[in-house]
């Protein structure tokens, strides 16, 4: 009997050892303790207000939701508010400090209504967050820095941003195989559309009608070039579509989807589809008006290629140069720091080179685009580690030349002119697949590069600078906030609060995210206690 009992005990012990595994971590929202018992209600509200201001800046620029959430949580935890909950649904941001045994809950909610892109402010915000998470900025000082950051004017004059938009169109026209006259007309047309868009935005015109007017102008210029100089209008119209698509959230919606924020992803996708419909309406109105005026034109849609599989060195050089030019000019049009211009052009040029190589090897357009996007995400993360520019700047510039503008135009042409719904549906599916490949590829590239942030041997030391790693990503190793040693940042008035710094750890008890950008007009601000 004793022998059987001993055997059963040994068997149970062996089963426990064999089946033992890491328990799933409790969610952050389930924790009811704070880092220090000295945190009062005023400090909590200051920290929550700071985190929601940072989130507003990022979300208004079209940054990924996971990135916004992770950055806001990093900042809150840096000020010992470890029970902060951040939730984003479409354009609504909610930050909350949960109730504890001795403190009431505090919730702040705001809604972001307008969007604006200024990558120089993104770079400043990135550096501010790195200083905060390193334990060197008091909460009052952080608020003062945010005030200065959001009130600072654009670093470039508006005419230079318009020139950047024109250069972006010039590079895209080179990618689409346009002649020199087509490239010049594309640049001029894009500059006109940019100035018109600024005027319409100043008087409060909805984005849908801005897209209608922009697409209409691009189509009419293409028709005029066809009548006067005999130029094929296809490349001009397709270039205009890519330029108009560059400011939309199609790729961002795919990034939200692959990182688990499905509701926000669907909302962004609906917004992108609605604005794409505005582009379609503008093209159709212009084509119908030209037809009613008795002007007959022929659009050779299939004659325009994306130079995915050129067979000669010169077309390859033109394609890579066009991609690099578009990446450089897009950063200028988006008010990016000058130090990020070269890296953005390098990213776009290398992505196009990968696209060409895989196309020549017989890979499909979607697979080639996905692989190139992985490279863009990887390179963007390495650049952000060196703190030369935020990852969003390099990633955006790298993938914009690969937007499915030509597929959208072919779909519109098939539906409206050729009356072939099957062909139009095929092109729409190709455009959607390309957008998904871009979004998922960038996220995967960031995942592959994320171990370099936290010391991957000599390679990690090559790309990683000294000090705390700063912002964490939605992928890779997770970091845990630990008190910074011998750091006592000073604030303006009141009690001084000891900040904390980020230190890598193998724990998996915090959410993950990846990075963001600049401010907007916010409404519906409420605080609930």
UniProtKB/Swiss-Prot annotation:
Keywords: Amino-acid transport, Cell membrane, Membrane, Transmembrane, Transmembrane helix, Transport. It comes from the Bacteria. GO terms for biological process: amino acid transport. It is found in: Cell membrane. Induction: Expression is significantly increased in clinical isolates. Expression level is positively correlated with lung cavity number of TB patients. GO terms for cellular component: cytosol; plasma membrane. GO terms for molecular function: transmembrane transporter activity. Residues 482-501 are annotated as: Disordered. It catalyses: L-threonine(in) + H(+)(out) = L-threonine(out) + H(+)(in). The chain crosses the membrane at residues 88-108, 168-188, 212-232, 234-254, 265-285, 312-332, 344-364, 365-385, 389-409, 428-448. Its main location: membrane. Catalyzes the export of L-threonine and L-serine from the cell to the extracellular environment. Export is dependent on the proton motive force. Required for in vitro growth and survival of bacteria inside macrophages. Increased expression is associated with low-level amikacin (AMK) resistance. PANTHER family: PHEROMONE-REGULATED MEMBRANE PROTEIN 10. Belongs to the ThrE exporter (TC 2.A.79) family. This is Probable threonine/serine exporter. It comes from Mycobacterium tuberculosis (strain ATCC 25618 / H37Rv).
